[in-house]
Structure formats: structure tokens, C-alpha cells
């Protein structure tokens, strides 16, 4: 079966020297990820893999089946999805996850959940209704107070306004309680702050009206949807939705640290002009906290029609302060020309749309564009709205907006510019082009190219996958570590530089000097103390003793005087006789020694016993669970491959046989399974030739997909091993084994696909910086490919991970195509596979063009 984690990564174009561009070679780069950690863990633990089924990683061991009964397994699987990691850990340790019977716990949990949901639903309804009623009453109260300034002194009109307001309050409350969306059920959590009231009173009118016009473009500006019976309910619902939406947005950005600053620092002329514009627009639209209601006595059709331009200006200016995520990210509005001092003096962050002089993410080019727009438009509109000439206080720049008609609203709203990480592949092709493809992890050598191609003048890589650099960072490409040069600092003193000796070297020097001293001199000299001798001769396993010895001893050994009646060991042979099992040397202390030596001897013996126990524990840890077979233990190089036996063949314990070369030359089973799946899914093929079958790793996987396989190898021993392994997997009847040389048999063969996996020369192939497929293979890699082309153009070339990609691409020939697939095993680059002919998987765009 083909690997699930497979993707096209890049397209590489290689241009041939002294050839036209039409002869370039297209190399499609892809990656396939397979996992076999379970198989590797099975090899480390020494578990037996059952023979039923093909995927051994999903099987359990015989020991696990014996321990768990079927009933326990069913109960565990039923509740597995409801357990958190801690509960799973407790279950794996045999501890109870919960107390009481399962049925009781389940029924109690269901009933409690139903009660809690009902209570929460009732609370939400109650709080929502109370909260809406309070907000609507307060806003209508403010509305009535403002209307008192506009309406006439006739008490009948005031009474009529109050009655209408009361009726509208009741109808609005009922309508909002019914038509409120589901997302507004959390309204009680939104707090109406003073900043929000200022913001809504200043900009809510424009937001509501702009959204209403976008929603119903057919209605004229002179209409009053809040008073018309046909649109009154729609307007109330529209108001409720926008109010809660912008309140939620406002509180979100306020929690992020943004602050709203009212436009109080503007120039007098600018502020005056805006005031006049607001006064002119007041007759058409009355700003309040809840609706855009206006008195019939003051709202006239003539004023509405004449002030359309001013109304559009208000809407365009209000768009600056919409706290939407797009505009906050864009933040390229410039208000520095309108203000005496920048608002950066305000502590904390400021919303870029509220007049901040510095943009958060905008580039200098974007800010210049917005300056040209904003500096040109208001100067013209100030002359239209007020009689005073205010353009002399502001610089006037020539722009293209001056030629627009007077009816068009000023273009203050910034356009949404995508960042580099938001661009699609086709929108910014320059950033996706690379000349060397460093992030792909390929090796480019200078070896001879196939088919007489001199060399490649340049290569061009276009990445098809986003964040290739970031993703490649977490993949093990098996690159060589670059070691930085060390900077050696020499001291200014002319004396001999100090060279620090290692601990082991100083110990050896002390021991050899002490052992080689003459016996006569040792008797005449003062004896060593017992503690010093023990510190000098003990093993180097204990780091604490090493530290104490460094503190007390220098490069030369110091000796403490003791009484003359205390004798020392006469020769090194006696020391060796007294050597303990743990590897430490203990001096024998005679009875006539000083009392200090006798007092210290029990302590030394206790330390020696502790060391023995520690070393025994270490030896027990290093012991393997299952001993290596004799044939593996006799060859040290194969010891690490024994732990990987289930990665090579999941049914290893069923009778798989390998020779010495087969251990490190066979393809891991998961990679072989992926290659076989790709071949079977590419096109309808019947016969596959495995030119160098070895012990049958790839041959068996091809046969498991239902294909007929011709397995060829020049070594009769490997043919016998491959036949045995095929019988273990039950596919021997689908394979025809031929013992012979592929170079001689190739002209006589006919097949749909040829799989090439020639010997790589042993494990030493990985030590080379770049693997030359022509000189490092035996037989020649170019000759093998040439003979395979006589059989079919559908060729699979299995190569080392450090193979020269330029050589592999040259196999496609001028104007040809090849797909180079990187095979990752547990996120480690293991091998690469080159596909030719109909086996190439082309991207969707390429296949559509073809």
C-alpha cells in the first residue's frame, strides 16, 4: 500500500550547457514518510511477532494475549476514547480509573449533564433578556434627551415622541429576544464600558448605515428604515447584531492592549471642519446609542438629498476606526498630518486606526500612499463644507483623487495587502524560486553525466509546498556537522603556558612512579598513609574521589609522615595480589601500624563494598534480555542489525534467513512496501523485474501487490535465501527466481517495470560526501540503466541518500523528466528513489496541461 504521508515538494529545472532552454531537464522532488517505530521496539524488547497479517507493527505479542482476557479487552476498548492520558496511565499500571460500577457511573453522568444543560439554558435566557432590556432603555433615554434639543417646544410633540419611544422600546425588546442569533447568548459576559459608549456614540451611526446600505443597496438614502413598517423589524435585528458584534470586537482588541482615543488632539481647522460636516449631516442622520431614529419635524428630504456627499464623507471617516482584524493588521492610516503631536505619547498600545503615528505592520510605501490620499481629499472637502480657507495650514499634494467626481466618497479605507506568509504559490512566484535547492537536502557532485551531457549551467528550484525551510529543519537529513574554528588566546606572559592535564593521565603518572620506586628506597622513606594510598590506587569510576584527589594532590605526589614502625607494601606484585574484584587497589595494613590507619581501614572496606554493588548493578543493566545468536555474536558489525531484524522482515521469527551481506543490503520492509504500492497504483502493470533481488526484500513486497516478479541475482546463495523468505510470506508461487548476471540477461527480458537496486558497496557508502552512481557501484550504474531502457522506460532506481542528484537527473536525457523521491523512515532520510517513464507522479497543474 502506498504511503499516506506523501507530497510534492519542489520542481527543479536543470539547464544543460551549450544547449537551448527547451532541452532542460525537469526533476520533480517529492517526499514519502513511513513509520516503523513499533517494529524497532519489538526488536529491542525481543518480542515474538505473530505470523498472521502483513503489518506486524499493529499486532500484539503472545505474552500480551495470554495476560488479557477477551472480556477485559472489550470493556477497555469501549471506554478508551473517554479517558484522558492520566487515566490511561493509571489503567496501564493496573490502578482503578474510577470507583463504583460502570453502569451506575454512566447513568449518573448522563442525568447530571442533562440537568446542568437545562440550568445553563435558563440562566442564559434570563440574563440575556434583562441585559437587553436595560441597554435598550438606557440608549432610548439618551435618544429622548437629544431629541428634546431638536423638537419644538410644543408639549404635544414631546408627549408624542415619548409615547412612540415607549412603544418602540417594547417592540424592540420583544423582537430582539426572538430574533437574536445563537452567538449572542453570551451577551451578559460583554461589559458596556465608558470607552465603548464613546466609541459607539461617535462611530456607531456610520457603521450601522454603511452595513445597511451594503445589505439593501436598492433603498434610497432618504428612506428611514427604522420608521417604515416594512423594514422596522429588519432594522432592529440589524442593529442588534451589529451592536453586539462590534462590542465583542472592541472588547477583544481592548483586552489585547489596544486603546481607543477620541480625536481631541486635532488641529482647530480640521476639527472645525469635521464639526461643520457633522452639523450638516445631523439633519440627515441622527447619531444615538441604539438606532438612527430622527424626528419627522427635523428630517427633511431636501437636506438629505443635498448632503449626500457629506454623509459619504462621514462613513468613509468612520471606516478608519473599525476594529476588525484585517484593518488592525494593516494599520497603514496616517493621521500625523492632522494632529499637532503624535499620539505615541499615550501609554500602552494604540489602535492604529485611532490616529497613531506609527503603523504596526505597514511598510513605508504603504504609508506614503495613504498620506497622498488623505492629504489631498480633506483639503477639497473642507472648502465645500465651510466658508473658511483651511488649506493654508496643511500641505497640498498633487494626487489622482482630485479628478474624481464630487459624488464619489473619499477613498480613505485602506486596501487589504497580504503578507508574505499569506501569499499563494501563484501570487508571488519570485519568493518561491531558488537557484540551488538547499532546503531539499540533495547532494550535487561533479561526476560524469549520463548520455554525453557535459554539465549543467544552472539549476532553478520552485517550491510547491509552503514552509519547506521550516519543515526541513525538523527532518534528519544526515548532513555533516560544521564545526566552527576555535579561537585560541595566547597570554602576554613570556613564560611557559599552562597546560591542564587530564585526570586519567595524572593518575597513571602517579601510579607508575610509585610502582617503579626501588624497594630499598621505599623502606627507608617514610611510608604512605593509608588514605593517600587508597586515593591514589582506586578506580576512576567515582568522580567524587577524583575531585578530592585533585584538591589534595598536585602533579607530584605528596606524602604525609607516619611512625617508623608502620611498614608499606614492598613491590607492585603484592599490590596486584591485593587487587579487589571491583578493579580498585587496597593496601594491606599490618597490625603494628598506627591507630589512624587501623581506624580508617573499616571505612575503606565499606567504600569498596559499595563500589562493588554499584558496578554489579551497571553490569545487570547492560545485559541484554535475549542473547544474540552465535552467528550474529561472532560478527560484531552485525550486532546493531539484530535489533532491527523486525524492521527488515516483520515475520523474522517465522523462518527468515539472511547472510552477512543481506543484513545491511536489504531494504527496510516499510520502504519496500511503499515502493511496491506506488508501482501498482501508477498504471496497470503485470510483470516486474527485480534485477538485483538479494535476499528478496523488494521482491516479496512486489509479489504481495499481486504482480508477477522475475527475481534475478548472480549469487546462488542469495537466490536460495530469497526463495526461503518468499515461502515464509506465502508468495513463492508468484516469483520466478533466476540465478544469473543481469547484464547478460537484460536483452532477453520483457517486462512492464524494472526495479534496480544494485549493491552500494557495503555500509561504507554513507561515509562519502557524494555517492557517484557510476564509479562507486559495481557494476556501472549508467550501464545498468542503459540495459534497463531496452526492456522498458518504466524504471525504478533505488539509490543511497547521498547520491549525486545531477547524475540521477541526467539519466532522463535532454528534455526529459524524472521524479526523485526522498524516503524518510521515522523522520530520518534513509534513501532516495528515482522514478522514470509512466511511474512519475505529476502535480495537478502539470497533469492538466499535459
UniProtKB/Swiss-Prot annotation:
Catalytic activity as recorded in UniProt: a 5'-end (N(7)-methyl 5'-triphosphoguanosine)-ribonucleoside in snRNA + S-adenosyl-L-methionine = a 5'-end (N(2),N(7)-dimethyl 5'-triphosphoguanosine)-ribonucleoside in snRNA + S-adenosyl-L-homocysteine + H(+); a 5'-end (N(7)-methyl 5'-triphosphoguanosine)-ribonucleoside in snoRNA + S-adenosyl-L-methionine = a 5'-end (N(2),N(7)-dimethyl 5'-triphosphoguanosine)-ribonucleoside in snoRNA + S-adenosyl-L-homocysteine + H(+); a 5'-end (N(2),N(7)-dimethyl 5'-triphosphoguanosine)-ribonucleoside in snRNA + S-adenosyl-L-methionine = a 5'-end (N(2),N(2),N(7)-trimethyl 5'-triphosphoguanosine)-ribonucleoside in snRNA + S-adenosyl-L-homocysteine + H(+); a 5'-end (N(2),N(7)-dimethyl 5'-triphosphoguanosine)-ribonucleoside in snoRNA + S-adenosyl-L-methionine = a 5'-end (N(2),N(2),N(7)-trimethyl 5'-triphosphoguanosine)-ribonucleoside in snoRNA + S-adenosyl-L-homocysteine + H(+)
Documented EC number(s): 2.1.1.-
Residue stretches of biased makeup (Polar residues): 375-390
Region annotation Disordered: where it falls in the sequence: 54-85, 278-311, 327-454, 523-566, 595-628
UniProt KW S-adenosyl-L-methionine keyword: yes
Residues noted as binding S-adenosyl-L-methionine in the record, renumbered to the chain: 713
Tissue: A 55 kDa isoform is widely expressed while a 90 kDa isoform is detected exclusively in brain and testis (at protein level).
Superkingdom of source: Eukaryota
Bias-annotated ranges (Acidic residues): 424-435
Sequence similarity: Belongs to the methyltransferase superfamily. Trimethylguanosine synthase family.
Function: Catalyzes the 2 serial methylation steps for the conversion of the 7-monomethylguanosine (m(7)G) caps of snRNAs and snoRNAs to a 2,2,7-trimethylguanosine (m(2,2,7)G) cap structure. The enzyme is specific for guanine, and N7 methylation must precede N2 methylation. Hypermethylation of the m7G cap of U snRNAs leads to their concentration in nuclear foci, their colocalization with coilin and the formation of canonical Cajal bodies (CBs). Plays a role in transcriptional regulation.
Quaternary structure (record): May form homooligomers. Interacts with CREBBP/CBP, EED/WAIT1, EP300/P300, NCOA6/PRIP, PPARBP/PBP and SMN.
UniProt-recorded name of the protein: Trimethylguanosine synthase
Species the sequence originates in: Rattus norvegicus (Rat)
